[in-house]
Every structure is written in C-alpha cells, then in structure tokens.
Curated annotation (Swiss-Prot):
GO BP, one annotated term: electron transport chain
Documented EC number(s): 7.-.-.-
Note describing how the cofactor binds: Binds 3 [4Fe-4S] clusters.
Designated name of the protein: Ion-translocating oxidoreductase complex subunit B
Gene3D superfamilies xrefs: 3.30.70.20, Electron transport complex subunit B, putative Fe-S cluster
Residues annotated as domain 4Fe-4S ferredoxin-type: 106-135, 136-165
Any one Pfam family match given in the protein's UniProt record, by short name: FeS
Signal peptide bounds: none
NCBIfam families reported in the protein's UniProt record: PRK05113.1 (NF003475), rnfB (TIGR01944)
Gene: rnfB
Amino acid sequence: MLTFWLAVATLSALALVAGAVLGFAARRFQVKTDPVAERIDALLPQSQCAQCGYPGCRPYAEAVAGGAPINKCVPGGEAVMLKIAAQLSVDPQPMDGEASSRPESRVAWIDEGNCIGCTKCIQACPVDAIVGATRAVHTVVSDLCTGCDLCVAPCPTNCIEMRPLAITPTSWKWDLRTIPITVIQQEQHV
C-alpha cells in the first residue's frame, strides 16, 4: 500500500512541476498579436484561397492592418470590403479589377471518368470541398466549394474545371433594385 501512495505522490509532484513549467513558458514566450488584425481576420471568409495575393486570410488581415488595400478579397467581395472599411474607419474602395471581373458563383467540377485518384486536388483544396481516397474517384461537394481555382492546377489529368454554380432558389442572387414596384393607394372608406 505504501508503494501505491508513493507512486501517486510522485506523479502528482511531477504533474505539478510540469504544469508550473508550462504556465511559465506560456507567459514568457507569449506571442503578441495585433488586435486590429484579429478583428479584420474575423471579418474575412476564411477560405484561405490566396486570390488576394497573400497565402491566406490571416496574412491578408495583417497586411490590411498595416495599410494594404482593403479591396482584394475575391470570395468576400464588396460586402467584406465594406465591413473592413467600417472597421478601420476608412473610405470604401472600388473592388479590385480581378475581384470585380471574376464570375461570382463558380464551383469546381471533376470529370470522374478521367480522375486517377492521385489526391493532389484534395491536398490543394483549402476548404476540404473535395472528397475521395487514394486511387479512387474524387468528387466536389459544391456547397463547400468557394471557387478559388486552387485545385485545377495540380491535377495531372486536367479533369477539373470551374463551372458556373447551378441557379437554385437558395443560390439565386436577387437584385431587388430591378424589381418594378407599384405603390397602390387605398381609398378611404367612411
């Protein structure tokens, strides 16, 4: 019985020392982050698509906090740019040429007859929208795909292409400014 309590005491002391060392290390080597970059990063869509010219959303947020243009986020579009402008109290900028000229709703499509199951597209996809296994046919989950094109280049058989998103009631972009509205005045009944 003495051996049992000795083992418990030894493990408890070891856990206490390890906890103290880890607590000290966490405070001593703490990485300080920019709170402005944190707020901007929270506004970005987190697709990590690199269409802005930065390797991901966090580096772009840090660059914007440092003064980079706020109009480079293609997946977020004008809505994200306006939120960033409001957050930083700066004037909104027109969308970048590449961001505005690109079709808004595109998804990757895999020709399953030519897919060899190499998994290079799965490794390139930043949002895990491609499913499949090694030497098996892959397919794209269109609800998750952001249309970033990063899966197209690594494909050795060129079986991936970007196609327009099929228009459904949930994906339709309603432009309420083009709907004619007629104001009907009701007659007063006494």
